[in-house]
Every structure is written in C-alpha cells, then in structure tokens.
C-alpha cells in the first residue's frame, strides 16, 4: 500500500507527500475542521495516527525499501512516549479546568431546548464555556469545550478515542454522539419511564 493510501485508510485527509523527518498535523475525515491526524514521514517508512480514533501509532513501510526495523521500533516507542506525555498533560489541564467551573445555566443548553438544565460552566476571557468531562474508565482524560454559539473543541493533545460522558439512571445502555443529543435521548427515555445510562461518545468512531 502506498503512503497516501495508508494515511487515508486511517481517516487522515492528505493530498500530497509531507516534509521528511518532522511531525505534521492534518485534518481527519471525522473532524475535518481539526487537525487530529499526525504523520512523521521518513522516506522508507512513516508513523501515522488519527488521535480522535486511535490510541497507538501505526507504522507504514515502503514495499520497495529495506527498513531498519530496530530503528523503526525505537522511533515508534519514542512517539508512543511523547503521545502519552501529551495525553497526561491534557488530563491534568482538564482537571484544572473542571476545578474552576461553576454549576449553572448556559446559552448552548438554552438553544438546544434545555433552558432549565445546568452544566459545568467555565468563565474564561469573558466567554462562558460549557465544559463536558470526557472519561475513559474511572479517569477524566480531557474535556469538550462548547461556546454559546455551539462551536466545540477539545484540548490539544488529549485522548479522545474511547472517551465518553454518561448520564446515569440505571437500566439499559444507550449510545449517542453529541452532548445535546444525549440530553434529548435522556429526556425522551425519562418521559417513557425507561431508565437508561446514556453514553455521549463525542464522535461516531467511539460508537463502534
């Protein structure tokens, strides 16, 4: 498989060959407005990761070249260490943000039809951001930040693959993509008197 096809198979939007020897960030199919794709092209081989969907680095190698596999393993291990360091830093920043939040109403919730619902609100630079903690197991690994107009973003470097936020009420488990969708599903199930744990997955890839 050629390099461009390999990258596209991982959901990375790329049209031309990148610079050799440096990490470059690219948009992804699932989040085209963000740069969740990471590539380091080395000529005979490359390291590729879609941070929104993958937790490990994938290695591409040219079909026509002799590859120093020991060097590839060392480089992959180094990339994995740096990735985990960035994820740990993001997790710590997420905790600091949540610690600064207050419970309150938010314009985004109002716009989605939930004027009486409260959430975590972070008052930052005269902007009220709705903060959604993102959990993997029992640990918060990041947050989704939602502006009053609905614009959303994650923290740089945070792990999003496998992360969820759950409205817990017991009963069945229901998956959905977005936070507002989760609120709607929760309200509908409550009206039907069907208890459920509604898991907000943040991306379609996390629902697979």
Located regions from the model:
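Non-catalytic accessory segments of DNA primases and related replication-initiation nucleases
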Residues: 1-107
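Residue-level "edge-of-site" marker
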Residues: 20, 122, 204
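Short amphipathic beta-strand and strand-loop transition segments with alternating hydrophobic
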Residues: 36-40, 118-124
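A short acidic, glycine/proline-enriched capping/turn motif at secondary-structure boundaries
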Residues: 55-57, 115-116, 139
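Catalytic cores of nucleic-acid editing and processing enzymes
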Residues: 93-96, 121, 145
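Phosphate-handling catalytic cores of nucleic-acid transaction enzymes
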Residues: 105-108, 116-122, 141
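Mobile, glycine-rich extracellular loop/lid and propeptide segments
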Residues: 112
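Phosphate-handling DNA/RNA-contact segment within nucleic-acid enzymes
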Residues: 125-208
């Amino acid at each position: 498989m050629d390099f461009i096809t390999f990258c596209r198979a991982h959901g990375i939007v790329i049209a031309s060959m990148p610079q050799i020897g440096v990490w470059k960030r690219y948009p992804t199919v699932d989040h085209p407005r963000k740069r969740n794709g990471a590539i380091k092209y080395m000529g005979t081989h490359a390291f590729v990761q879609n941070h929104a969907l993958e937790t490990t680095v994938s290695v591409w190698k040219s079909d026509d070249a002799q590859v120093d596999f020991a060097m590839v393993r060392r480089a992959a291990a180094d990339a994995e260490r740096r990735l985990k360091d960035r994820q740990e830093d993001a997790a710590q920043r997420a905790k600091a943000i949540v610690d600064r939040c207050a419970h309150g109403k938010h314009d985004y919730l109002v716009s989605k039809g939930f004027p009486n619902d409260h959430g975590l609100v972070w008052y930052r630079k005269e902007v009220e951001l709705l903060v959604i903690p993102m959990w993997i197991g029992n640990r918060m690994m990041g947050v989704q930040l939602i502006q009053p107009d609905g614009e959303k973003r994650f923290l740089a470097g945070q792990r999003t693959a496998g992360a969820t936020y759950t409205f817990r009420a017991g009963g069945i488990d229901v998956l959905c993509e977005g936070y507002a969708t989760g609120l709607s599903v929760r309200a509908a199930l409550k009206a039907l008197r069907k208890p459920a744990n509604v898991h907000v997955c943040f991306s379609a890839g996390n629902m697979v």
